[in-house]
């Protein structure tokens, strides 16, 4: 859950300020507006906390009636989160009879990061191993625990509290992201984590807190408050855009590979600029050569009940009958009954080809050329 209070160098934004130290102070000049996604995430965390406390036999008040974003999906996600931690607890009990479980534990990692603090969703400590678990309700971005700087900051804060009490030698960090069917775990030795903190985290955090260091653009710009106006981002993307003055057939393979590695960032930047300019225009700013107009809209009913009544009174059926989609059908039947009745009628067609970095975990597709070469080799 997001920490209470304001931290210039928050763990959640550490991926950005570790790559681009000056962005920390730059973002400080912008208002924190929040978002519906953040509000939904906060509600989900509250429900997760309740579910876990209840599963552990602790007293806790059901927050459901006060959650603006509560729905059946959030209920399932929170239940799954609590079950996951209870299963992890059962596993640790096999090796340690008295593991420690902490929920919504405030952690302080200010030994390495000025004013560094946060709140860890769950911490589980057993013989030799400390588990740090973070719930992510987001759907848009798949979050990995591997070398995740936010998780490492939380782990450092947890070690500050418990390293002198328990004999910890291994830290296990887990991201639980149910809406992406993602459970990502990364283990590191305590010594390696401390080495990273001393050699990478602290020196960079000192630069960031002082507003020093060099600007650097990358995928971490996505959540930067200054991304719409950042001059370093403009210069980096305009430099890449200069390739557009060559027709693709004239580009070398290496040039195309450079563009491919940055194209998503370029598209994202262009979209950010358009959205920023639009919001400024709505607020009254006038851009030379541009004007604000009413966009296209589609007709809609002012009252669906009135439409339904009028059509039925005229002797017609206003509703279409449509087969439920797979997700809705599974909710209707239940998972086991769904598999029993419909497994034979479900298929997953091959996905549309998409070009991704080599680091992507999905296996490479066979192209027509590869298929031909395989047949040729087998002859």
Map each language-model feature to its residues.
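Extended, charge-rich alpha-helical segments
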Residues: 268-379
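Mg2+/Mn2+-dependent nuclease catalytic core
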Residues: 39, 98-206
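Short coil/turn segments at secondary-structure boundaries
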Residues: 27-29, 60-65, 99-104, 215-222, ...
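Hydrophobic/aromatic-lined pockets within catalytic cores
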Residues: 52-56, 137-140, 155-163, 206-209, ...
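DEDD superfamily 3′-5′ metal-dependent exonuclease/proofreading module
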Residues: 2, 46, 52, 56-63, ...
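Metal-dependent nuclease catalytic cores that hydrolyze phosphodiester bonds in DNA/RNA
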Residues: 1-130, 170-172, 263
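Short, charged, low-complexity amphipathic alpha-helix
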Residues: 195-265, 363, 367-379
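Alpha-helix N-cap/helix-initiation motif
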Residues: 33, 37, 142-144, 252
